[in-house]
Amino acid sequence: MLPTARKLVFSEVPIVDLGPAWRDDAGRAEVADAIAAAAGTVGFFYVRNHGLAEQDVRDIFQTAVDFHSLPLEAKMEVSLKLNDHAQGYLHGMTKGNDANIKENLQEAFQIRRPLADDDPDLLAGKPLHGRIPWPSAMPDLKPRMMAYYDKINGLGYRLLELFELSLGLAAGTLKASFAKDMNSLRLLHYPPQRPDESGEHLGARGHTDTNAFTILAQDANGGLEVRNRDGEWVAVPPVEGTLVVNVGEVLKVWTDGVFTSAVHRVINRSGNERYSIPFFMYPSFDAWIQPLIRNPDPANVAPEDLPTSFPRDRPFVYGELKARNVARIMPQKSVA
């Protein structure tokens, strides 16, 4: 059920227990209501009893540590600068074609849903469709990442069903836009920053996510912050046994702004190396995105003042906007 009253000034991020959703229909309805309340006020929420084993989460963090411990030349072998589909290694302090974007203090390795060798979109060179570049120096990276990918992807689709229920939509309504999803897994590493860092140098600058929603595993170091309507940065500290879910621009459009895609950032003041593992639920490239419900309170929508904001006043092909956004923020292979 959609939230009837929304207070976009918040001081903490709520926790949603998914356990009842795996029990029966009444539990699913209870959880869907809790998700709607969190998505319509904060745009961020923790989930517990999510179904991923603690060992699976520990394993993917160790995978991230092992990859980012490789020599730089081994990582640069799979630099996303060497391809035009934005998969591979993103070196810290690099950026895309927008001169106004400042560098982030991070490095990452990212993949999307693997494509078959005879995939027609891959063979046609369709934007954002390409083979994953795996580093030769870490031959077990592929099986380790794919083991986690398959499990977190399953959770993503279970959450998608709960979002459908929370909006009163028929089962499969949102899933139809994921017929050939571009879901993405990223291994992020943030070097330590000064404890008194005020915001000039950031691990990740304030942004919204250009997907449906994100499922984040974060380590014990903290640093993630979400901005409320008063412009205050609210900490999203690690909570044992939970994952963090945040609403992206696509869900904001689908709900006509009822669900809020909150601006968030990362400042690693811990003094330690910080790792986080986001999983992005991306619709199919060719999915048409437009509001699926009407906002009963259109005046109570967060301002759309970021380059990452998606339009709600006209339908659009998801992949076209996503490809333009990727070109803005990420380095890509030079085209003569």
Predicted features by range, described:
Residues 1-336:
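Peripheral, non-catalytic segments flanking oxidoreductase cores
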